[in-house]
Swiss-Prot record:
Free-text comment on the cofactor: Binds 1 Mg(2+) ion per subunit.
UniProt xrefs under SUPFAM superfamilies: Glutathione synthetase ATP-binding domain-like (SSF56059), Succinyl-CoA synthetase domains (SSF52210)
EC number: 6.2.1.5
Gene name tied to this protein: sucC
Name of the molecule in the record: Succinate--CoA ligase [ADP-forming] subunit beta
Pathway: Carbohydrate metabolism; tricarboxylic acid cycle; succinate from succinyl-CoA (ligase route): step 1/1
Family, as annotated: Belongs to the succinate/malate CoA ligase beta subunit family.
Signal peptide as annotated in the record: none
Keywords: ATP-binding, Ligase, Magnesium, Metal-binding, Nucleotide-binding, Tricarboxylic acid cycle
Quaternary structure annotation from Swiss-Prot or TrEMBL: Heterotetramer of two alpha and two beta subunits.
Cofactor entry: Mg(2+)
GO CC annotations on file: cytosol; succinate-CoA ligase complex
NCBIfam families hit by this protein: PRK00696.1, sucCoAbeta
Length: 386
Protein backbone atom coordinates (compact mmCIF):
# COMPACT_ATOMS: atom_id res chain seq x y z
CA UNK A 1 0.00 0.00 0.00
CA UNK A 2 1.27 3.46 -0.92
CA UNK A 3 0.61 6.71 0.90
CA UNK A 4 1.14 10.36 0.04
CA UNK A 5 4.23 12.40 0.82
CA UNK A 6 2.50 14.48 3.49
CA UNK A 7 1.27 11.32 5.22
CA UNK A 8 4.74 9.76 5.14
CA UNK A 9 6.17 12.91 6.71
CA UNK A 10 3.61 12.79 9.50
CA UNK A 11 4.74 9.25 10.33
CA UNK A 12 8.43 10.11 10.15
CA UNK A 13 7.87 13.13 12.38
CA UNK A 14 6.24 10.85 14.94
CA UNK A 15 9.45 8.81 15.01
CA UNK A 16 11.64 11.86 15.58
CA UNK A 17 12.74 12.80 12.06
CA UNK A 18 12.56 16.52 11.27
CA UNK A 19 10.26 17.59 8.44
CA UNK A 20 9.25 21.05 7.15
CA UNK A 21 6.00 22.56 8.37
CA UNK A 22 3.22 21.99 5.88
CA UNK A 23 -0.54 22.03 5.30
CA UNK A 24 -2.61 19.88 2.96
CA UNK A 25 -5.10 21.67 0.67
CA UNK A 26 -8.05 19.95 -1.02
CA UNK A 27 -9.80 22.97 -2.54
CA UNK A 28 -9.27 26.63 -3.37
CA UNK A 29 -11.45 27.60 -0.40
CA UNK A 30 -8.72 26.35 1.96
CA UNK A 31 -5.83 28.26 0.38
CA UNK A 32 -5.79 31.47 2.45
CA UNK A 33 -6.01 29.69 5.81
CA UNK A 34 -3.33 27.21 4.74
CA UNK A 35 -0.90 29.93 3.67
CA UNK A 36 -1.43 31.80 6.95
CA UNK A 37 -0.64 28.64 8.94
CA UNK A 38 2.70 28.16 7.19
CA UNK A 39 3.93 31.72 7.81
CA UNK A 40 6.89 31.45 5.46
CA UNK A 41 8.29 33.84 2.85
CA UNK A 42 8.90 30.91 0.51
CA UNK A 43 6.08 28.41 -0.03
CA UNK A 44 6.59 25.18 -1.94
CA UNK A 45 3.45 23.85 -3.66
CA UNK A 46 3.57 20.08 -4.16
CA UNK A 47 1.11 17.91 -6.07
CA UNK A 48 0.14 14.85 -4.03
CA UNK A 49 -0.02 11.81 -6.28
CA UNK A 50 1.27 8.26 -5.88
CA UNK A 51 4.11 8.69 -8.35
CA UNK A 52 7.61 10.08 -8.47
CA UNK A 53 9.08 12.52 -10.94
CA UNK A 54 6.67 15.30 -9.96
CA UNK A 55 9.26 18.06 -10.13
CA UNK A 56 10.13 17.49 -13.79
CA UNK A 57 6.41 17.34 -14.65
CA UNK A 58 5.55 20.66 -13.02
CA UNK A 59 4.19 19.12 -9.84
CA UNK A 60 6.53 21.02 -7.48
CA UNK A 61 6.49 24.83 -7.62
CA UNK A 62 8.57 27.16 -5.44
CA UNK A 63 6.60 30.36 -4.74
CA UNK A 64 8.16 33.51 -3.34
CA UNK A 65 5.00 35.61 -3.11
CA UNK A 66 1.44 34.90 -2.02
CA UNK A 67 0.17 35.54 -5.53
CA UNK A 68 2.64 33.05 -6.98
CA UNK A 69 1.54 30.44 -4.44
CA UNK A 70 -2.16 31.00 -5.12
CA UNK A 71 -1.62 30.81 -8.88
CA UNK A 72 0.38 27.59 -8.53
CA UNK A 73 -2.30 25.99 -6.35
CA UNK A 74 -5.08 27.05 -8.72
CA UNK A 75 -3.26 25.64 -11.74
CA UNK A 76 -2.26 22.44 -9.98
CA UNK A 77 -5.53 21.38 -8.34
CA UNK A 78 -7.56 19.31 -10.77
CA UNK A 79 -4.76 19.11 -13.32
CA UNK A 80 -3.28 15.87 -14.63
CA UNK A 81 0.39 15.07 -14.10
CA UNK A 82 2.23 12.73 -16.44
CA UNK A 83 5.57 11.52 -15.07
CA UNK A 84 7.90 8.63 -15.83
CA UNK A 85 6.12 6.67 -13.08
CA UNK A 86 2.52 7.26 -14.19
CA UNK A 87 0.66 5.74 -17.11
CA UNK A 88 0.48 7.67 -20.37
CA UNK A 89 -2.83 9.11 -19.14
CA UNK A 90 -1.19 10.53 -16.02
CA UNK A 91 -2.77 11.03 -12.60
CA UNK A 92 -5.23 13.69 -11.52
CA UNK A 93 -4.10 16.04 -8.74
CA UNK A 94 -6.83 16.07 -6.10
CA UNK A 95 -4.81 17.65 -3.30
CA UNK A 96 -1.68 19.73 -2.92
CA UNK A 97 0.73 20.11 -0.03
CA UNK A 98 1.93 23.59 0.95
CA UNK A 99 5.27 23.53 2.68
CA UNK A 100 7.64 26.10 4.09
CA UNK A 101 10.76 26.74 2.04
CA UNK A 102 14.02 25.49 3.51
CA UNK A 103 17.58 26.76 3.53
CA UNK A 104 19.40 24.04 1.60
CA UNK A 105 23.15 23.69 2.04
CA UNK A 106 23.53 20.08 0.85
CA UNK A 107 21.23 17.29 -0.38
CA UNK A 108 21.60 13.64 0.60
CA UNK A 109 19.73 10.42 -0.06
CA UNK A 110 18.72 7.81 2.52
CA UNK A 111 16.28 4.93 2.36
CA UNK A 112 15.40 1.59 3.87
CA UNK A 113 14.05 -1.41 1.99
CA UNK A 114 13.24 -5.03 2.72
CA UNK A 115 16.14 -6.93 1.16
CA UNK A 116 14.55 -10.25 0.25
CA UNK A 117 17.82 -11.71 -0.99
CA UNK A 118 19.46 -11.37 2.43
CA UNK A 119 16.31 -11.55 4.55
CA UNK A 120 17.22 -8.25 6.19
CA UNK A 121 16.42 -4.56 6.09
CA UNK A 122 18.96 -2.63 4.03
CA UNK A 123 19.79 1.03 4.66
CA UNK A 124 20.98 2.88 1.55
CA UNK A 125 22.81 6.20 1.79
CA UNK A 126 24.34 8.60 -0.71
CA UNK A 127 25.79 12.09 -0.61
CA UNK A 128 24.15 12.66 -4.01
CA UNK A 129 20.54 13.48 -3.11
CA UNK A 130 17.74 15.15 -5.00
CA UNK A 131 18.14 12.97 -8.10
CA UNK A 132 17.09 9.43 -9.00
CA UNK A 133 19.24 7.05 -6.98
CA UNK A 134 19.26 4.67 -9.94
CA UNK A 135 21.14 7.29 -11.97
CA UNK A 136 23.68 7.76 -9.19
CA UNK A 137 24.15 4.00 -8.82
CA UNK A 138 24.68 3.65 -12.58
CA UNK A 139 27.04 6.60 -13.04
CA UNK A 140 28.82 6.77 -9.66
CA UNK A 141 28.26 3.48 -7.82
CA UNK A 142 30.96 4.34 -5.29
CA UNK A 143 28.70 7.13 -4.00
CA UNK A 144 25.93 4.71 -2.99
CA UNK A 145 26.50 2.79 0.25
CA UNK A 146 24.31 -0.11 1.38
CA UNK A 147 24.29 -1.56 4.88
CA UNK A 148 22.36 -4.72 5.78
CA UNK A 149 20.95 -4.91 9.31
CA UNK A 150 20.93 -8.30 11.01
CA UNK A 151 17.47 -8.61 12.60
CA UNK A 152 18.92 -10.46 15.59
CA UNK A 153 21.10 -7.52 16.65
CA UNK A 154 19.17 -4.66 15.06
CA UNK A 155 20.61 -1.29 14.13
CA UNK A 156 23.93 -0.50 15.82
CA UNK A 157 26.09 2.61 15.84
CA UNK A 158 28.68 1.06 13.57
CA UNK A 159 26.04 0.71 10.84
CA UNK A 160 25.72 4.48 10.68
CA UNK A 161 29.48 4.96 10.70
CA UNK A 162 29.81 2.46 7.85
CA UNK A 163 27.26 4.41 5.82
CA UNK A 164 29.24 7.63 6.22
CA UNK A 165 32.80 6.26 6.27
CA UNK A 166 33.85 7.20 2.73
CA UNK A 167 31.74 10.35 2.43
CA UNK A 168 34.16 12.86 4.03
CA UNK A 169 31.55 13.81 6.60
CA UNK A 170 32.40 15.33 9.95
CA UNK A 171 31.86 13.55 13.25
CA UNK A 172 28.79 15.70 13.91
CA UNK A 173 27.31 15.00 10.47
CA UNK A 174 27.95 11.27 10.89
CA UNK A 175 26.29 11.29 14.30
CA UNK A 176 23.18 13.02 12.95
CA UNK A 177 22.87 10.77 9.90
CA UNK A 178 23.36 7.70 12.09
CA UNK A 179 20.51 8.89 14.30
CA UNK A 180 18.25 9.37 11.27
CA UNK A 181 19.15 5.93 9.90
CA UNK A 182 18.31 4.34 13.26
CA UNK A 183 14.95 6.13 13.35
CA UNK A 184 14.16 4.98 9.81
CA UNK A 185 14.99 1.41 10.81
CA UNK A 186 12.72 1.66 13.84
CA UNK A 187 9.94 3.09 11.68
CA UNK A 188 10.28 0.16 9.27
CA UNK A 189 9.92 -2.37 12.06
CA UNK A 190 7.05 -0.73 13.91
CA UNK A 191 4.92 0.10 10.86
CA UNK A 192 5.67 -2.97 8.71
CA UNK A 193 6.81 -0.67 5.93
CA UNK A 194 8.38 -2.29 2.89
CA UNK A 195 10.17 0.90 1.84
CA UNK A 196 11.03 4.30 3.29
CA UNK A 197 12.79 6.81 1.07
CA UNK A 198 13.91 10.33 1.95
CA UNK A 199 15.14 12.11 -1.15
CA UNK A 200 16.41 14.61 -0.57
CA UNK A 201 17.47 14.59 3.03
CA UNK A 202 18.79 18.14 3.29
CA UNK A 203 21.37 19.74 5.53
CA UNK A 204 20.69 23.39 6.34
CA UNK A 205 23.31 26.08 6.86
CA UNK A 206 22.74 25.71 10.61
CA UNK A 207 23.61 22.00 10.44
CA UNK A 208 20.11 20.58 10.83
CA UNK A 209 18.97 17.59 8.78
CA UNK A 210 15.42 17.68 7.38
CA UNK A 211 13.41 15.23 5.28
CA UNK A 212 12.45 17.44 2.34
CA UNK A 213 10.63 14.67 0.48
CA UNK A 214 9.47 11.30 1.72
CA UNK A 215 7.97 8.12 0.33
CA UNK A 216 6.62 5.11 2.21
CA UNK A 217 5.20 1.79 1.06
CA UNK A 218 3.65 -0.86 3.30
CA UNK A 219 3.38 -4.63 3.19
CA UNK A 220 -0.21 -5.43 2.18
CA UNK A 221 0.00 -8.73 4.06
CA UNK A 222 0.75 -6.94 7.34
CA UNK A 223 -1.44 -3.87 7.00
CA UNK A 224 -4.23 -5.49 9.04
CA UNK A 225 -2.02 -4.95 12.09
CA UNK A 226 -2.02 -1.19 11.52
CA UNK A 227 -5.57 0.14 11.19
CA UNK A 228 -4.28 3.69 11.70
CA UNK A 229 -2.13 3.31 8.57
CA UNK A 230 -4.88 1.59 6.60
CA UNK A 231 -6.98 4.72 7.16
CA UNK A 232 -4.40 6.64 5.10
CA UNK A 233 -5.22 4.64 1.97
CA UNK A 234 -6.33 6.89 -0.88
CA UNK A 235 -8.57 4.90 -3.22
CA UNK A 236 -8.67 7.79 -5.69
CA UNK A 237 -4.99 7.16 -6.37
CA UNK A 238 -5.51 3.49 -7.11
CA UNK A 239 -6.68 1.85 -10.33
CA UNK A 240 -10.37 0.79 -10.04
CA UNK A 241 -9.70 -2.61 -11.62
CA UNK A 242 -6.99 -3.34 -9.07
CA UNK A 243 -9.29 -2.39 -6.20
CA UNK A 244 -12.04 -4.65 -7.54
CA UNK A 245 -9.59 -7.52 -8.07
CA UNK A 246 -8.36 -7.33 -4.48
CA UNK A 247 -11.94 -7.81 -3.25
CA UNK A 248 -12.01 -11.22 -4.95
CA UNK A 249 -8.53 -12.36 -3.98
CA UNK A 250 -7.09 -11.70 -7.44
CA UNK A 251 -3.69 -10.21 -8.16
CA UNK A 252 -4.19 -7.62 -10.90
CA UNK A 253 -1.88 -4.99 -12.34
CA UNK A 254 -3.09 -2.74 -15.13
CA UNK A 255 -0.78 -2.23 -18.12
CA UNK A 256 -0.94 -0.27 -21.36
CA UNK A 257 -1.51 -3.06 -23.91
CA UNK A 258 -4.64 -4.42 -25.59
CA UNK A 259 -4.56 -8.17 -24.88
CA UNK A 260 -6.04 -9.22 -21.56
CA UNK A 261 -4.40 -12.10 -19.68
CA UNK A 262 -5.87 -14.55 -17.19
CA UNK A 263 -3.30 -16.90 -15.71
CA UNK A 264 -2.76 -18.94 -12.54
CA UNK A 265 0.59 -18.29 -10.93
CA UNK A 266 2.77 -15.19 -10.98
CA UNK A 267 5.63 -16.85 -12.86
CA UNK A 268 3.33 -18.21 -15.55
CA UNK A 269 1.66 -14.80 -15.81
CA UNK A 270 5.00 -13.11 -16.46
CA UNK A 271 5.92 -15.75 -19.04
CA UNK A 272 2.56 -15.19 -20.73
CA UNK A 273 3.14 -11.45 -20.93
CA UNK A 274 6.63 -12.03 -22.31
CA UNK A 275 5.43 -14.27 -25.13
CA UNK A 276 2.67 -11.83 -26.08
CA UNK A 277 5.35 -9.18 -26.48
CA UNK A 278 7.52 -11.67 -28.39
CA UNK A 279 4.81 -12.05 -31.01
CA UNK A 280 4.47 -8.29 -31.39
CA UNK A 281 1.64 -7.21 -29.10
CA UNK A 282 1.33 -5.73 -25.61
CA UNK A 283 -0.41 -7.22 -22.55
CA UNK A 284 -3.21 -5.16 -21.04
CA UNK A 285 -2.75 -6.56 -17.56
CA UNK A 286 -1.13 -8.98 -15.16
CA UNK A 287 -3.89 -11.11 -13.64
CA UNK A 288 -3.18 -14.10 -11.40
CA UNK A 289 -6.30 -16.02 -10.37
CA UNK A 290 -4.28 -18.12 -7.93
CA UNK A 291 -4.25 -21.83 -7.30
CA UNK A 292 -7.80 -22.25 -6.00
CA UNK A 293 -9.88 -20.32 -8.51
CA UNK A 294 -13.61 -21.05 -8.52
CA UNK A 295 -16.26 -20.41 -11.16
CA UNK A 296 -17.13 -17.16 -9.40
CA UNK A 297 -13.48 -16.10 -9.34
CA UNK A 298 -13.11 -16.77 -13.06
CA UNK A 299 -16.30 -14.81 -13.77
CA UNK A 300 -15.07 -11.82 -11.78
CA UNK A 301 -11.69 -12.03 -13.51
CA UNK A 302 -13.37 -11.82 -16.93
CA UNK A 303 -15.44 -8.84 -15.78
CA UNK A 304 -12.33 -7.01 -14.63
CA UNK A 305 -10.42 -7.74 -17.85
CA UNK A 306 -13.34 -6.66 -20.05
CA UNK A 307 -13.77 -3.40 -18.13
CA UNK A 308 -10.42 -2.34 -19.60
CA UNK A 309 -11.74 -2.42 -23.20
CA UNK A 310 -9.28 -5.06 -24.40
CA UNK A 311 -9.19 -6.30 -28.00
CA UNK A 312 -8.65 -9.95 -27.07
CA UNK A 313 -8.14 -12.29 -24.11
CA UNK A 314 -5.60 -15.06 -23.54
CA UNK A 315 -6.33 -17.57 -20.78
CA UNK A 316 -3.31 -19.66 -19.82
CA UNK A 317 -3.92 -22.21 -17.05
CA UNK A 318 -1.65 -24.92 -15.70
CA UNK A 319 -3.65 -27.41 -13.69
CA UNK A 320 -1.82 -28.58 -10.62
CA UNK A 321 -3.97 -28.41 -7.52
CA UNK A 322 -6.60 -26.79 -9.72
CA UNK A 323 -8.14 -29.17 -12.26
CA UNK A 324 -8.46 -27.96 -15.85
CA UNK A 325 -12.00 -29.32 -16.23
CA UNK A 326 -13.15 -27.15 -13.33
CA UNK A 327 -11.51 -24.12 -14.92
CA UNK A 328 -13.11 -24.99 -18.27
CA UNK A 329 -16.55 -25.13 -16.68
CA UNK A 330 -15.83 -21.82 -14.99
CA UNK A 331 -14.86 -20.23 -18.31
CA UNK A 332 -18.01 -21.56 -20.00
CA UNK A 333 -20.26 -20.38 -17.17
CA UNK A 334 -18.58 -16.96 -17.11
CA UNK A 335 -19.07 -16.46 -20.84
CA UNK A 336 -22.70 -17.54 -20.63
CA UNK A 337 -23.29 -15.13 -17.74
CA UNK A 338 -21.54 -11.98 -18.95
CA UNK A 339 -20.95 -12.54 -22.66
CA UNK A 340 -17.62 -11.87 -24.34
CA UNK A 341 -17.49 -9.96 -27.61
CA UNK A 342 -13.72 -10.13 -28.17
CA UNK A 343 -11.57 -13.06 -29.36
CA UNK A 344 -10.77 -15.57 -26.61
CA UNK A 345 -7.92 -18.08 -26.79
CA UNK A 346 -7.53 -20.67 -24.04
CA UNK A 347 -4.55 -22.90 -23.33
CA UNK A 348 -4.94 -25.59 -20.67
CA UNK A 349 -2.21 -27.90 -19.43
CA UNK A 350 -1.85 -30.24 -16.48
CA UNK A 351 -4.47 -32.12 -14.47
CA UNK A 352 -7.45 -33.15 -16.63
CA UNK A 353 -6.41 -30.82 -19.46
CA UNK A 354 -7.83 -33.19 -22.12
CA UNK A 355 -11.23 -33.13 -20.43
CA UNK A 356 -11.05 -29.36 -20.01
CA UNK A 357 -10.20 -28.83 -23.69
CA UNK A 358 -13.02 -31.18 -24.73
CA UNK A 359 -15.52 -29.23 -22.62
CA UNK A 360 -14.45 -25.97 -24.27
CA UNK A 361 -14.51 -27.42 -27.79
CA UNK A 362 -17.99 -28.89 -27.26
CA UNK A 363 -19.44 -25.76 -25.67
CA UNK A 364 -20.29 -24.23 -29.07
CA UNK A 365 -19.03 -20.93 -27.72
CA UNK A 366 -16.59 -18.68 -29.55
CA UNK A 367 -13.53 -20.12 -27.79
CA UNK A 368 -10.28 -20.99 -29.56
CA UNK A 369 -8.25 -23.66 -27.78
CA UNK A 370 -4.50 -24.11 -28.17
CA UNK A 371 -2.15 -27.02 -27.45
CA UNK A 372 0.69 -24.96 -26.00
CA UNK A 373 1.53 -21.43 -24.90
CA UNK A 374 3.36 -20.51 -28.08
CA UNK A 375 0.38 -21.46 -30.24
CA UNK A 376 -2.01 -19.65 -27.91
CA UNK A 377 -0.02 -16.41 -27.92
CA UNK A 378 0.53 -16.54 -31.68
CA UNK A 379 -3.19 -17.05 -32.30
CA UNK A 380 -4.47 -14.25 -30.07
CA UNK A 381 -1.89 -11.74 -31.36
CA UNK A 382 -2.65 -12.46 -35.00
CA UNK A 383 -6.41 -12.45 -34.50
CA UNK A 384 -6.27 -9.08 -32.76
CA UNK A 385 -4.01 -7.60 -35.45
CA UNK A 386 -6.44 -8.51 -38.26
Amino acid sequence: MNIHEYQAKQILKRFGISVPEGVIVHSLNEVNDAINKINSKVIVVKAQIHAGGRGKAGGVIVSRTLDEAKTAIKNMLGSTLVTHQTSKDGQKVRKVYLEEGCDIKKEYYISAIVNRKHGQISIIFSTEGGVDIEEVAANSPEKVVTCNIDPIFGFQGFHGRNLCFDSNLSVDQTRKITSIAEKIYKTMLETDASQIEINPLIETSSGDFIALDAKMNFDDNAIYRHPEILELRDYDEEIPEEIEASKHGLSYIKMDGNIGCMVNGAGLAMATMDIIKYYGAEPANFLDVGGGASQQTVTEAFKIILSDNVDGILVNIFGGIMRCDIIANGIIAAIQEIGINVPLVVRLSGTNFELGKKLLDNSKLNIITAHDLSEAAYNIVNIVKK
